[in-house]
Every structure is written in C-alpha cells, then in structure tokens.
Amino acid sequence: MKRTLDIGVLLSRSGMYAALAYASRLGVLQGVAEVNADHTLDVAFRVVERDPEGRLDRYAPLCREILRDSQARHIFGCITSASRKEVIPELERFGGVLWYPVPYEGFEASEHVAYMHACPNQHLIPLLDWALPSLGKRAYFVGSNYIWGWEMARIARERVAAAAGDVLGDRYIAVGDTDLDHIIQEIRALKPDFILNSLVGDSSYAFLARLAELKQEAGFQSGLTVLSCNFTECEVESAGSAAEGLVSAGPWFEPEGGSGGSFHEIARQSVHELAKLLHGRPGADVLPLSELVQSAAGSGHTPRLDPTNLHARQPAIIARLLNGRFQEIKRLPPLAADPYLTRQFGASHDGPLLKVVS
C-alpha cells in the first residue's frame, strides 16, 4: 500500500528562461508518474505546483505558500541562482528542502538544498582544461548580470591565468537583455580564441544569433568557438542553427536525439532519488536533508548526494552541437563535487573536505 506525500514544484511556465524551466518541469512530472507507477516503492507523490512566471519577486512568496498551505516539505524547482537564493530563507523558516536540478556556480552548501546537477569542478574546470590547449589561450567572457555570470567569469579568469592565458573582455548584460551591439563590436575587434557564454535564456539566443552573423565575415569563419556550462538540448529549438558548433559541458547529454537534455533528466532522477530516500521510512520526509541522506545510507540505499555537502557526484562530459545534436568530445568519470574548490582539480584525493552546517 503506497502512502501519498505532497511535493512542491516551483518552475516558471513563461518568462525569459521558459525553455529551461519547461524541460525541468517535464522531468519532474515524468519522475512523479514513474514513481507513482512503481509498485516496488511504498511512496507516491502528489504535486503542489506554483508558477513564478519568470519573475524573481514571486519565488519566495510562492515557496512560502507551498510550505505553509500544503504538507509538502520537498520542492523541485528554481532555474536561476538568483531564484534559488530567494527561496532559501523560506526553506529555513519552514524546514523545507529544494531539489535543485540545474548547474550552478558553486560556493554554496545549504542544509536545505539538494544540489543534484553539476558545480564548477564538474563542468567549468573540465571544459576550460579541454579548451585552453585545444582552442587557444585568448578568452572572452560574456554573462548575465547576476551571480551565475559573475562567478563563472571569476573562476574562469583564475583558470585562464593559471594556464598563462589572457582574458580579453568580461562583459555582462541584464537577464533577458538582447542589446548586444557593443559586445559584438568588441569581439570583432579583439578576435578571441574562444568565448565563454554564461548568458541565460533569451539573452543567450540573441547573442548566438548575432555571433553567427559575425562568423560570416572574413577572418571569422574558422574561429569564435562558444563554450557554455548551461546550454543543453532543451534550448536548441529556441537558439536555432546559430548554436551550431557550440561546446557545452554537463553530466548528461541525450543519447538518441531527445530534446530535454540534462535539465529534464536530472529533474527526473531527483524525483526518483527522493522516493528511494523515503521508501520504507514513514515520516522521514520531515527530517533534515543531511540526516535523511545519512539514515538512508544506513538502511542499504546508496544516496546520490554526499551527506557532507549535499551535492551529487557527476561525470563531466564535454560535447559539441553538430546538426542539432550534441556529440561527445571527452568524458571524465564521476567526480565528487567540490563546491568551494578546496582542492586542485585532478588531485588524487577525491573525497569531500566540507561538512554542511545549518
């Protein structure tokens, strides 16, 4: 006999990054359907959903509403780091947990967040370690003007400097902004070996379109490779052919040409992981996340999350978009998350060095 538990879903169905949220939402709903149909599990989930509509000011109130007005203590959602940080105080107030299924910039370890996707030692650093010897050492950074863009550029700048490279430019625009003339003009003048694109949603699609036009000019046909740690299959339709040749890093790419990418797949896996953590353990949904993970490990389940920092171990895959599909270039085996970059990438020690504190 299954027991039914409320879970929250806090993902935008509209707004400037709707394609990303759409893929994650479908992944969550698929995971719920699979868990509810799995008779080997004694839990089923009932979805309590709220739509922030891509507006940052709606995330915290809607998170509060889910936690206050339902029995849900676990919420799946948020796409941007700004929205994640908005809801953490509400999670702390009500004892909730956010299952965060998308890549982020690291330098965070909340007791109330399950970081299921990749952090920089699992995406950005492997990507740069491939790019610098393969493409050249003259880099240009462009990103959305919030913590994701800032931190990705900061970490990348340090990595480029360590390789004796140069950062030719480091520019930011507001999320959703598509006024890119000054950036395109600068790239035309500087001719970098590669561009790290940390733009989000509509801004990224507009940038790729403008860059595709620039590549038609003499002297650019064979250069201007774009790197990304947040572009997946779920954005290929929105970006169109302008994204061709983009090189992305992540823990999972569609093996047979699907359109959801890792945003869909990690969201789906996250629902399954929660179900396994709660299976056979009535009342465990109200436990602190680290305690839930540790106690499940003691019951025979091997958790996806490291109980010391609540980040998932993930492989690092580098792939290039060709003919609308990502083709793998390089794959590293699953890496323990190092959200604060407290150890050198590639060092022999691969165990956690941090402990989550509430």
Predicted features and spans:
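Extracellular/periplasmic periplasmic-binding protein-like sensory domains
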Residues: 211-282
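An alpha-beta-alpha
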Residues: 116-171
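Extracytoplasmic "Venus flytrap"
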Residues: 4, 8-29, 50-54
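Periplasmic-binding protein-like
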Residues: 69-79, 99-101, 140-141, 191-207, ...
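Segments of small-molecule ligand-sensing domains
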Residues: 275-350, 356-357
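Beta-alpha junction/loop-to-helix N-cap segments that form part of ligand/metal-binding clefts
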Residues: 24, 39-106
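Extracellular glycoside hydrolase catalytic/binding regions
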Residues: 96-126
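Short beta-strand elements in bilobed, periplasmic/extracellular small-molecule ligand-binding domains
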Residues: 38-54, 110-112, 160-177
